[in-house]
């Protein structure tokens, strides 16, 4: 929840979600 993964999730889910990133405020974050 604090480290940006450099990916947005406005239209599609976080591809980086495979690495543990989650969508928050249309941006993918790690932890």
Swiss-Prot record:
PROSITE patterns linked to this entry: CYCLOTIDE, CYCLOTIDE_BRACELET
Pfam families, per the entry? Cyclotide
InterPro entries in alphabetical order? Cyclotide, Cyclotide_bracelet_CS, Cyclotide_sf
GO annotations under biological process?
defense response
User: How is the protein modified post-translationally, according to the record?
Assistant: This is a cyclic peptide.
Disulfide bridge positions per record: 5-21, 9-23, 14-28
Q: Which key words are in the record?
A: Disulfide bond, Plant defense
Keyword field contains Disulfide bond: yes
Source species, domain of life: Eukaryota
> Could you tell me at which residue positions the Cyclopeptide (Gly-Asn) crosslink is annotated in this chain?
1-31
Similarity-based family:
Belongs to the cyclotide family. Bracelet subfamily.
What is this protein for, i.e. what is its function?
Probably participates in a plant defense mechanism.
The domain section of the record reads: The presence of a 'disulfide through disulfide knot' structurally defines this protein as a knottin.
Identification of the protein by name: Cyclotide pali-A
Q: Which organism is it from?
A: Palicourea guianensis (Showy cappel)
